[in-house]
């Protein structure tokens, strides 16, 4: 909260210059129109005039007006080019400025600065060695990571038999749990255009996460949040229709670039997975309350 915000300062500065350019362009347009309009009567007078001296005077006035119009047009072209450049930079910055965070959120460079907000139940520590999750799955012949590695490389796996059925059952449970909470179930597109990607994440995040379809303006989603939020791009919502409470299922695809060292064993850091998501579109003043409801839904779904 106390950090310097150079990007915010820059966008404010660029916005002020952009508005000044707009103002100057409008002023020049008005002056150009006035001069062009003034030439009409002068041409009429010139056509009817027999006095050579008067004709020369009228022609000189017309030429002066035309020269002024030309000068205004050249200046307008410069200003409009600057205006476009400023607008592009403003948009670039706006894509990278995140939402405001709650004052209670701890500030720090990484997740080691996180604090425990609330605890539900107490962890049970058994008196025997705890097998790793993939060891349990392998004991049921429920996972084949070696074959997946040969087929697609690291970060993929086959689920088999009852483990595959359990996977589907958990997804169905999560879906029905949210539907019972009054959320509308949605299956969104699993790909999206680049402008939607830019609207939901920064370029460094996009580069680290997203798979791009070669030769197409399409990206595989890293989470259904992307297309769920993208559904409202360029839309104005009726406040009376809020809140919109939505729950979505999707497969998710992530490069996991730069994630090395963050629990790489097993099926944590993988390139393909499925999940159930919660999305609420609400009034800003209701955001904190909905956040509380959403994380409580996550806890209760696991009880």
Model-derived regions, located:
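N-terminal alpha-helical targeting/anchoring segments
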Residues: 1-123, 138, 142
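TRNA-recognition modules of translation machinery and tRNA-sensing kinases, especially anticodon-binding
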Residues: 119-302
């Amino acid at each position: 909260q106390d950090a310097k915000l150079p990007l915010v300062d820059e966008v404010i500065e660029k916005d002020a210059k952009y508005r000044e350019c707009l103002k100057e362009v409008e002023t020049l347009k008005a002056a150009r129109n006035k001069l062009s309009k003034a030439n009409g009567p002068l041409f009429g007078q010139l056509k009817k005039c027999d006095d050579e001296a008067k004709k020369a005077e009228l022609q000189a006035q017309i030429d002066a007006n035309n020269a002024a119009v030309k000068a205004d047009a050249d200046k307008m072209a410069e200003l409009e080019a600057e205006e476009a450049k400023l607008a592009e930079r403003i948009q670039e910055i706006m894509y990278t400025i995140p939402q405001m965070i709650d004052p209670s959120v701890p500030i720090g460079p990484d997740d080691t600065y996180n604090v425990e907000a609330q605890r539900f139940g107490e962890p049970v520590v058994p008196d025997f060695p705890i097998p790793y999750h993939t060891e349990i799955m392998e004991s049921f012949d429920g996972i084949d990571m070696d074959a997946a590695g040969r087929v697609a490389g690291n970060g993929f796996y086959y689920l088999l038999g009852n483990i595959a059925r359990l996977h589907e059952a958990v997804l169905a449970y999560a879906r029905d749990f949210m539907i019972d909470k009054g959320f509308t179930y949605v299956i969104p597109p699993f790909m999206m255009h680049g402008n939607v990607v830019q609207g939901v994440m920064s370029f460094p995040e996009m580069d680290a996460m997203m798979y791009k379809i070669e030769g197409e303006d399409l990206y595989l989603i890293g989470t259904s949040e992307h297309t769920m939020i993208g559904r409202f791009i360029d839309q104005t919502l009726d406040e009376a229709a809020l809140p919109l409470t939505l729950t979505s299922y999707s497969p998710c695809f992530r490069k996991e670039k730069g994630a090395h060292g963050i629990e790489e064993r097993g099926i944590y850091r993988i390139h393909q997975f499925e999940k159930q998501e919660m999305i609420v579109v609400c009034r800003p003043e209701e955001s904190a309350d909905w956040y509380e409801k959403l994380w409580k839904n996550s806890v209760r779904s696991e009880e």
